Curated annotation (Swiss-Prot):
Keyword Hydrolase part of the UniProt annotation: no
Tissue occurrence: Ubiquitously and homogeneously expressed in the syncytial blastoderm and during the cellularization stage. In stages 11-12, it is expressed in the germ-band layer In later stages (stage 14), it is mainly detected in the ectodermal tissues. In imaginal disks of third-instar larvae, it is uniformly and homogeneously expressed in eye-antenna, leg, wing and haltere imaginal disks, which is consistent with the former ectodermal expression detected in latestage embryos.
One GO biological process term: intracellular sphingolipid homeostasis
Membrane topology: Multi-pass membrane protein
Organism of provenance: Drosophila melanogaster
Transmembrane segments: 23-43, 102-118
Protein family (similarity comment): Belongs to the ORM family.
GO cellular component: cytosol; endoplasmic reticulum membrane; serine palmitoyltransferase complex
Name this protein carries in UniProt: ORM1-like protein
Keyword Phosphoprotein: no
Subcellular localization(s) per the UniProt record: Endoplasmic reticulum membrane
Length: 154
């Protein structure tokens, strides 16, 4: 009898845990708690708290979904998904699933809320817009498996 990583029968749990029950709620509550943490800092204004929340969220999104490759539970030598980012492994690579749509919509909605609360101030708009573009482009189906400028090729 062989033991499968994760103990629940899936060869690569990386592909399905984001679709698990309660993940979306936990994700949004975590995002809200980070924002409230920024708001609780005495010298941070509301626009800066929104900008910091947006930039931190997008940086974490970019790193955890589009930079890290492979699955932590599998051997790196024999794992066929070792060259895929976490985003490319979600739902076994199937495009436009509800999980992928949710993870694409959250940065966009957060950007729109940030624009609303910063009143489209150029000082806040430019970094927020750049981070939105950087975190949204890799999510498009046309970029599945594409490594721009050979970044993150290996």
């Amino acid at each position: 009898m062989t033991s499968i990583a994760g103990g629940h029968g899936e060869a690569n749990p990386n592909s399905s845990w984001l679709s698990a029950r309660g993940f979306w709620l936990a994700y949004l509550l975590g995002l809200l708690s980070v924002h409230l943490l920024f708001l609780s800092v005495p010298f941070v204004s509301i626009p800066w708290a929104w900008t910091a929340t947006n930039l931190l969220h997008n940086a974490a999104h970019l790193y955890f979904l589009h930079v890290i490759k492979g699955a932590p539970w599998l051997s790196t030598e024999n794992d066929p998904s070792r060259r895929w980012t976490h985003w490319e492994q979600i739902d076994d690579g199937v495009q436009m699933t509800t999980t992928r749509k949710f993870l694409t919509a959250v940065p966009i909605v957060l950007f729109l809320l940030t624009c609303l609360y910063t009143r489209n101030n150029t000082e806040h708009f430019i970094p927020n817009f750049i981070s939105l573009v950087v975190v949204t482009l890799p999510k498009l189906p046309q970029f599945h498996g594409v490594r721009l400028f050979n970044i993150n090729k290996y």
